[in-house]
From Swiss-Prot:
One of its GO terms (molecular function) is uridine kinase activity. It is found in: Cytoplasm; Nucleus. This is Putative uridine kinase DAS2. Pfam families: PRK. Pathway: Pyrimidine metabolism; CTP biosynthesis via salvage pathway; CTP from cytidine: step 1/3; Pyrimidine metabolism; UMP biosynthesis via salvage pathway; UMP from uridine: step 1/1. Its EC number is 2.7.1.48. It catalyses: uridine + ATP = UMP + ADP + H(+); cytidine + ATP = CMP + ADP + H(+). It comes from Saccharomyces cerevisiae (strain ATCC 204508 / S288c). It is an enzyme of class 2 (transferase).
Length: 232
């Protein structure tokens, strides 16, 4: 299959956000959701937070090999069994790739191929509390170490490298509106899948019944008119 055909069947969704905002969890939740909604697509999650380079963190973009990450995005899913062939509606299914992590919106090349870019927004106090819970802090010494790391490294990293990527988002989901934000996000991905299937199959699916969790059109959500949609 040529590169153009592969690109036509690839949907990239990028989800960024600050430390301990649940970016990885929402990506896995979306993966499970779309596995239940569609059996004709391959779904992959690329979690940048699990791909930090080296043993010593720099607390900046140099912690990530974006060339390698981009190659993983471009990598075509291989159908490995006859069961896979039977399972899919057609032999070469759509690839849905969810790129997530603090730096998911940092690389320009990944942003350019992403059909939807999302930023999970949360205030500093809530991020710190979530981080303490995530690290399962059990002693005053551990708490002191974590707060030192937060003040000396994580907070400056958020301010200098992660927070600025918020401007690249098409959709901003605040922590106070997660359920509504998730509904909008799911329906946006559904629309991207149906549009892609329509292009592949060469027919109009506008009248086709699809899962309706949130209607972009009915709510006058025009991403071409407005650079991003902020739910706060």
């Amino acid at each position: 299959m040529d590169r153009k055909a592969v690109e036509e069947k690839r949907i990239v969704i990028s989800i960024g956000g600050g430390h301990a905002t649940g970016v990885g969890a929402i990506a896995l939740d979306l993966q499970n959701t779309f596995k239940s909604l569609y059996n004709s697509i391959n779904i992959r999650v690329i979690n940048l937070d699990n791909m930090i380079e080296g043993n010593i963190k720099s607390y900046n973009n140099n912690d990530y090999d974006f060339d390698n990450i981009l190659n993983l995005v471009y990598e075509k899913h291989a159908v490995t069994s006859q069961n896979d062939m039977i399972q899919h509606d057609y032999e070469d299914p759509i690839d849905l790739i969810i790129v997530c992590g603090c730096y998911a919106l940092y690389d320009k090349r990944i942003n350019e191929i992403s059909q939807l870019k999302v930023f999970l927004d949360s205030d500093a106090d809530k991020r710190l509390i979530s981080l303490i819970k995530k690290k399962n802090v059990g002693s005053n010494e551990q708490l002191a170490q974590l707060i030192t790391e937060y003040m000396d490294h994580l907070r400056p990293e958020m301010q200098q490298y992660i927070e600025p990527t918020r401007t690249f988002a098409d959709l901003i989901i605040p922590s106070t509106n997660e359920n509504l934000g998730r509904a909008v996000l799911v329906d946006g991905i559904v629309k991207a899948i149906e549009d892609t299937k329509s292009q592949i199959e060469g027919n109009n699916t506008n009248n086709k019944i699809r899962p309706r969790l949130w209607d972009f059109e009915a709510e006058t959500m025009d991403l071409e008119k407005d650079r991003y949609y902020d739910l706060s």
